[in-house]
């Protein structure tokens, strides 16, 4: 199966520990015989300027995308269509990776893995302004075909945002 992983968390030369768990997950999928490609949407703070890379043996295309720069989010969205072409599945990781798909979903089946514990108890641990913003962003959790999480508790909290509680 050809899978394109789209993530905002992935190791760079500038930040080698960032998203190492996503890289390991991707490498394990490749070891199981899947054709894995990675698109890393890199914020300015971790972007090392390398656009084509290999991490843990995986081909990586790195696009600049800072959430505070809407033009970069839109540019990333435009490039994602071509970068995911030919994939059997698009697999996004983390809520921030949903933003480029706010205006249009991928053409392929879409799996999303959520890592953000900020959604716990509908953002109860966040300040009021952050909680309000999170509620808007979390509506994007309804868009993927399938959403999985990194823990049972996170799955329970996320069910409130999914159309049928799945």
Where are these regions (language model features)?
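Alpha-helix capping/helix-boundary segments
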Residues: 96-97, 153-155
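Short His-centered aromatic/hydrophobic patch
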Residues: 92-98, 114
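Membrane-proximal helix-turn-helix segments that form the acceptor-binding/catalytic region
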Residues: 118, 128-147, 161
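Hydrophobic anchor at the start of a short beta-strand
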Residues: 36, 110, 165-166
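Helix-loop-beta element that forms the nucleotide-linked donor phosphate-binding surface
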Residues: 104-105, 143, 155-166
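Proline-centered loop/turn at the N-terminus of a beta-strand
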Residues: 109-111, 146
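N-terminal subdomain of nucleotide-sugar transferases
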Residues: 1-47, 54-59, 85, 146
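A short, charged, and often flexible helix/loop element on the N-terminal side
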Residues: 54-81, 121-129
């Amino acid at each position: 199966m050809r899978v394109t992983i789209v993530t905002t968390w992935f190791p760079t030369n500038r930040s080698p520990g960032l998203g190492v768990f996503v890289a390991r997950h991707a490498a394990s999928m490749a070891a199981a015989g899947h054709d894995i490609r990675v698109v890393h949407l890199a914020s300015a703070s971790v972007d090392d300027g390398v656009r084509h890379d290999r991490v843990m043996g995986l081909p990586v295309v790195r696009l600049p995308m800072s959430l505070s720069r809407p033009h970069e989010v839109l540019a990333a969205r435009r490039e994602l269509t071509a970068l995911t072409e030919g994939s059997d599945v698009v697999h996004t990781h983390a809520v921030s990776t949903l933003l480029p798909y706010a205006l249009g979903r991928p053409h392929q089946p879409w799996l999303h893995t959520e890592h953000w514990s900020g959604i716990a108890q509908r953002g109860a641990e966040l300040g009021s302004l952050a909680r309000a913003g999170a509620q808007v962003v979390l509506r994007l959790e309804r868009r993927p075909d399938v959403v999985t999480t990194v823990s049972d508790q996170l799955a329970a909290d996320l069910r409130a945002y999914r159309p049928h509680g799945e």
